[in-house]
Amino acid sequence: DRLRSRGLGDVYKRQVQPLGNSDGKWKAIVDNMTELCGSAPQLIDELYKSESATNFNNRSIAWLLKNYNRIYDDPDMSLDLYTRQCSMGITAEQLSICGATIANEGLNPNTNKQVFDKALAPKITSMIATVGFYQHTGDWLYTSGIPAKTGVGGGVMGVMPGVMGISAFAPPLDDAGNSVKAQLAIKYIMNKLGMNVFNGHRIHVQ
């Protein structure tokens, strides 16, 4: 259950308003994902039921956090919301649009809707850059040049600020839970295009 336990920080994030209202919270989460992706993701019911039946580690940690007053809503409800969110099905196209929305300072390039405050974009991108590939994050940034977030479902979403979002999907994972083929695909494209978030333009002073 090592991979699943990594998401307990996200359980904490499930404490969105309104407190105590699971349906209201879930609607807020789905609406936000829909605005980011430009279309609604779908809950994979079979995966949700399977995860719910086996997430004992996360459940224990959630109640431990509650004991230390670090979860301010019902821990079982918070964990259920997190598990549901982890069981959402999303296409590579939707994931690319999500990345493009972040790269475009919160403005969805397809719907032209401002999804979140543009001031949050660099904060979101920096979080993706620093933890997106778990223990392989440094290696990924060094070799690919693009901040990216990976998921244990086999998806990888890259964010090139001011330029684009890019994604790839392939289920086989490496030892850190990152898609092997999706990494190679995005890395190849970025290197082929010569795009790197760390590239700088030289300023010539005359």
Task: Please provide the spans of the model-predicted regions.
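Active-site-proximal helix/loop microenvironment
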Residues: P18, L43-T111, V115
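Conserved active-site and cofactor/substrate-binding residues in soluble primary-metabolism enzymes
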Residues: G24, A28, F56, S60, ...
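Non-transmembrane alpha-helical segments in soluble domains
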Residues: V30, T34, A62, S96-G99, ...
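Single conserved hydrophobic/aromatic residue that forms the stacking wall/gate
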Residues: D1-Y12
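Short, charged, amphipathic alpha-helices and their helix-cap/turn boundaries
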Residues: S5-R6, N21-Q42, L64-N69
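Structured C-terminal helix/loop/strand segments within mature extracytoplasmic catalytic/sensor domains
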Residues: I102-Q206
